[in-house]
């Protein structure tokens, strides 16, 4: 069986140009693609080297998203970065972008009001991974569940994804 391998520049050349998403993050993606090509990589995957650049790319893609934002996080804190990205996500939803947010339930404890508020938005869907059955009792419920056979609570979602469809 023949496998066709594409480098990042080849894949980018096949994409239709001119979407809002392309204009917002095109330079950053072209830079990553060029670095992949120089290194002879067969995939277009590259790490973003620092937090500031990663933040900028996420904010730009939220602003440029046209159809959907699919977000998956182990932890989304209420710090400055979390609040700023949350604002960008809410603005995208207000523009009509469908937002799906999947969070690990352990780090969603204590944030029920914020998450419930987001979930009332017609364009935002909030889901919790591996929900705590006794979550109504907060952190005490988590500890009780661990004490009484909460072996499943050790299964956490450590993934992070920010996928925008422009």
Regions found by a protein language model. Name each.
Residues 1-165:
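N-terminal localization/anchoring segments of enzymes in phospholipid and broader phosphate metabolism
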């Amino acid at each position: 069986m023949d496998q066709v391998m594409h480098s990042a520049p080849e894949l980018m050349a096949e994409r239709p140009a001119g979407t809002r998403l392309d204009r917002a993050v095109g330079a950053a993606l072209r830079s990553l693609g060029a670095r992949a090509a120089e290194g002879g990589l067969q995939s277009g995957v590259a790490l973003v080297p620092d937090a500031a650049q990663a933040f900028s790319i996420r904010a730009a893609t939220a602003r440029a998203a046209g159809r959907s934002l699919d977000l998956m996080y182990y932890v989304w804190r209420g710090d400055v970065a979390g609040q700023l990205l949350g604002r960008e996500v809410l603005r995208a939803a207000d523009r009509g972008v469908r937002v799906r947010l999947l969070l690990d339930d352990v780090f969603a404890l204590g944030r029920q009001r914020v998450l419930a508020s987001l979930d009332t938005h017609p364009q935002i869907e909030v889901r919790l991974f591996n929900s705590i059955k006794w979550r109504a009792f907060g952190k005490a419920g988590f500890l009780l569940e661990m004490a009484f056979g909460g072996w499943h609570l050790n299964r956490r979602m450590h993934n992070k994804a920010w996928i925008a469809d422009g």
